[in-house]
Structures are given as structure tokens and as C-alpha cells.
């Protein structure tokens, strides 16, 4: 499987309008054309909070993703609706193609319908985007999965997935130096306990601040809340 990771900004109080227009004009049509929207989150804390969303779509392969794009481009009705009702709302869209790292927790390959998850309980997600110097991601991943992930599975926190970038920012001819981590928390209190433990637990603090961060060039973090049409919740 490969995944499309997308960031959409709609400033000036237009995000709610964007949610409604996306569900009405595009959500069903895009799924009919072969993509599965597995996750959609509003940014609650972080840059562009209250005016941006992250989306993840699942495809069987890069070829399937390209075929999906071609079908969408040929759909004149969808394109007309998008230009009229969605494009004027969006300020910025950034897209990358990512692939789950082998050591990462598995994601389902088959998902229920969007309507089957509406109204179901939702947790919170922290998304961290990790940047590495070219050629150093493999060394980071060894430390990350062998030491950091087990230590951070506490206070209700669970790593949901970990991606490397295949196409987009942070890629070179020889590989990826940009990864995306998604971790779920049952509630904000759980996230706060988890984060405070990285200060109060001296052994954990050393692991995070000295061992792990020595392998990372830069970290960007946002707290996300699933939209009601998000399958990941």
C-alpha cells in the first residue's frame, strides 16, 4: 500500500464551509474513482490551527494512485464542482506520497464506509513530521523502533503508523529524509500525562532529548482531532 498525505489550509473562517463543500462535492466522487480516505483531521494546536486539515488516502500502489488521478481529471462534472465550490475556499494545498515503514504498526487494508463511522467516539492524534540529514534516516529508524516506540507506549498513547516520504518534500534519488508519525491518545488528559512524563521520568527524558533527538534534524508537531468522516479516529 501507498498513501497520499495532504495538507489543506482554508483561512478567514472558511474551514467549516470547506468541510461541508468537500463532503457534498468531492468525498463520494473521489472514493468512487478508487481512493479511500482513511483519515481526516482538523488542526487543533499548532501552525494554522483552526484553519487547516490533514488527510490520508490509501492506494494499492503508485500505479493505482496514478490511475485514480487520471479518472479524476476525466470527470468533468467533479472538476466543475471543485472549481466552483472548493477551489475558492482553499488557500493552500500540499501533497506528498508516503509509504508505511516496515516496522510500523499495520494499518487495515479494508475499511468500512464513511457513514458507518459517523458519530463514533474519537480520540486525539499527535502528528510529528521528522526531518533528517540525507542518508541518516536508517540509523534514526533503528533507535526509534527499538528504543523510543516501546518507551512511549504509555498513558494510553499508541503509535498508529509511521511513514517515509516517497514523493514530495524531503526526498532524494536515494531515499527519504522526511518521516511522518501519527500517535493516538484517548483524550487530551492522556496526551498531557504522556508529555509530562518525558520531563519527570529522567530515564525517559534522556532517551527522548539526548538519544532520539540526536538522530533528528528537525521536528514539527501538531495536535489533531478527527473530523466526523474520518475512518481513523
Task: List the predicted regions and their residue ranges.
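Surface-exposed interaction/gating patches
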Residues: 2-17, 102-169, 174-189, 228-233
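An amphipathic, aromatic/His-enriched active-site/gating alpha helix that lines ligand/cofactor pockets
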Residues: 16-39, 45-50, 58-101, 146-147, ...
Amino acid at each position: 500500500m501507498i498513501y497520499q498525505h495532504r495538507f489543506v489550509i482554508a483561512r478567514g473562517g472558511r474551514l467549516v464551509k470547506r468541510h461541508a463543500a468537500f463532503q457534498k462535492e468531492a468525498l463520494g466522487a473521489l472514493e468512487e474513482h478508487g481512493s479511500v480516505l482513511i483519515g481526516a483531521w482538523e488542526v487543533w494546536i499548532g501552525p494554522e490551527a483552526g484553519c487547516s486539515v490533514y488527510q490520508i488516502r490509501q492506494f494499492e500502489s503508485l500505479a493505482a494512485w496514478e490511475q485514480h488521478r487520471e479518472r479524476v481529471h476525466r470527470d468533468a462534472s467533479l472538476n466543475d464542482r471543485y472549481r466552483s465550490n472548493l477551489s475558492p475556499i482553499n488557500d493552500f494545498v500540499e501533497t506528498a506520497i508516503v509509504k508505511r515503514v516496515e516496522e510500523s504498526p499495520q494499518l487495515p487494508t479494508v475499511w468500512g464506509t464513511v457513514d458507518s463511522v459517523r458519530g463514533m467516539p474519537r480520540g486525539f492524534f499527535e502528528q510529528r513530521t521528522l526531518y533528517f540529514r540525507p542518508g541518516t534516516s536508517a540509523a534514526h529508524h533503528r533507535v526509534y523502533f527499538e528504543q523510543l516506540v516501546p518507551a512511549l507506549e504509555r498513558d494510553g498513547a499508541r503509535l498508529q503508523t509511521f511513514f517515509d516520504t516517497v514523493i514530495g518534500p524531503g526526498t532524494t534519488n536515494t531515499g527519504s529524509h522526511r518521516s511522518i508519525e501519527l500517535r493516538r491518545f484517548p483524550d487530551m488528559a492522556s496526551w498531557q500525562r504522556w508529555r509530562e512524563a518525558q520531563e519527570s521520568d529522567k530515564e525517559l527524558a534522556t532517551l527522548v532529548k539526548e538519544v532520539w533527538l540526536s538522530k533528528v534534524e528537525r521536528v514539527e508537531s501538531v495536535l489533531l482531532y478527527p473530523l466526523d468522516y474520518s475512518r481513523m479516529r
